Amino acid sequence: MLYLIGLGLGDAKDITVKGLEVVRRCSRVYLEAYTSVLTVGKEALEEFYGRKLILADREEVEQEADNIFKDADVSDVAFLVVGDPFGATTHSDLILRATKLGIPYQVIHNASIMNAVGCCGLQLYRFGETVSIVFWTDTWRPESFFDKVKRNRANGMHTLCLLDIKVKEQSLENLIRGRKIYEPPRYMSVNQAAQQLLEIVQNHRARGEEPAITEETLCVGLARVGAEDQKIAAGTLQQMCTVSLGEPLHSLVITGGNLHPLEMEMLSLFSIPESQSTDGL
């Protein structure tokens, strides 16, 4: 049996009781290490679970999954995912491949940012389509996701923005030369996401288009949701460029405009103090 087990968002103890029981009896336990990260390292997980973990990076999962499936038809193999197993399409692909190989599977769910984002006080049923914001490069500066933000805003829906994670990525030069040399991990911050969004706003204005959001649009920055030191900050998009939320992982919410009074009251708990605002806001 192949088990896909969600680990939740905080630390080693966020795994469910059912998930922990399965981990402790499996012959092999893989830890997916590229779509998200916990606030604790692999060693802390191993100590709490009482098991050695095999790190599974993007290449292992997407190109060499046969190693994961090996003997899963006659023994139990666990694949651990930060958050919920269905937080990334890669994990659906694992299930499809397992099914084609005749390997039975079971999913053990947990909290993910997709539902835990409600901790900021915005009502989950008022969220529209989720978007991803990636690191821009000198030659690649995608803006297509902004159309989804526009549609959500038109419908009065909030937009959860998942921010880019670069783990075990290769530079273009090393990729072309076939050198397995990897760049240091990078995690997009709320500040970086807000700065890119403001540039998109300026680009729309330069083209004579009315942008879906402005510098004054109310947003919410979230960091390390589910951890003991999670941080939440509510303020304008301009303020998101400078607010200090600390270590990763970060997420950003662009509000849908008209807020429910309860949402407004909840967001007031996380308002950025005037002392943290930059001049001219």
Swiss-Prot record:
It is an enzyme of class 2 (transferase). S-adenosyl-L-methionine binds at L9, D84, G87, S112, I113, L163, V225, H250. GO terms for molecular function: diphthine methyl ester synthase activity; diphthine synthase activity. One of its GO terms (cellular component) is cytosol. It comes from the Eukaryota. This is Diphthine methyl ester synthase. Pathway: Protein modification; peptidyl-diphthamide biosynthesis. It comes from Mus musculus. The modification Phosphoserine is found at S171. Its EC number is 2.1.1.314. Keywords: Methyltransferase, Phosphoprotein, S-adenosyl-L-methionine, Transferase. SUPFAM superfamilies: Tetrapyrrole methylase. It catalyses: 2-[(3S)-amino-3-carboxypropyl]-L-histidyl-[translation elongation factor 2] + 4 S-adenosyl-L-methionine = diphthine methyl ester-[translation elongation factor 2] + 4 S-adenosyl-L-homocysteine + 3 H(+). Belongs to the diphthine synthase family. InterPro entries: 4pyrrol_Mease, 4pyrrol_Methylase_sf, 4pyrrole_Mease_sub1, 4pyrrole_Mease_sub2, Dphthn_synthase. S-adenosyl-L-methionine-dependent methyltransferase that catalyzes four methylations of the modified target histidine residue in translation elongation factor 2 (EF-2), to form an intermediate called diphthine methyl ester. The four successive methylation reactions represent the second step of diphthamide biosynthesis.
